[in-house]
């Protein structure tokens, strides 16, 4: 399967990393590595995580505070959002 990041998910990730890096660069690097590792693992096990709150999505809890929202297609796993667990979503 191919991994695809939607523009909104990339913007979420960039904003999140910028915010965390202002406070701690090492923490931002660790979180980004965890998010990227989780995302790449989705190509091997796309149904490992729970069904999402939005129909047709799934939610991977990367860290107690951060969730990857994704869709599984025939040939792709599409990351659609990266959200904080306290963020109102959808």
Residue map of PLM features:
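Absolute protein N-terminus
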Residues: 1-2, 90
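Basic, Lys/Arg-enriched alpha-helical interface segments
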Residues: 2-57, 73
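A beta-hairpin/wing motif
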Residues: 57-63
């Amino acid at each position: 399967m191919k991994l695809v990041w939607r523009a909104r998910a990339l913007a979420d990730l960039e904003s999140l990393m910028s915010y965390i890096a202002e406070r701690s660069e090492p923490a931002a690097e660790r979180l980004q590595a965890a998010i990227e590792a989780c995302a790449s693992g989705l190509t091997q096990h796309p149904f490992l995580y729970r069904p999402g709150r939005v129909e047709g999505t799934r939610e991977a809890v990367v860290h107690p505070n951060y969730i990857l929202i994704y869709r599984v297609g025939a040939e792709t796993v599409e990351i659609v959002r990266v959200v904080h667990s306290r963020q109102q979503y959808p």
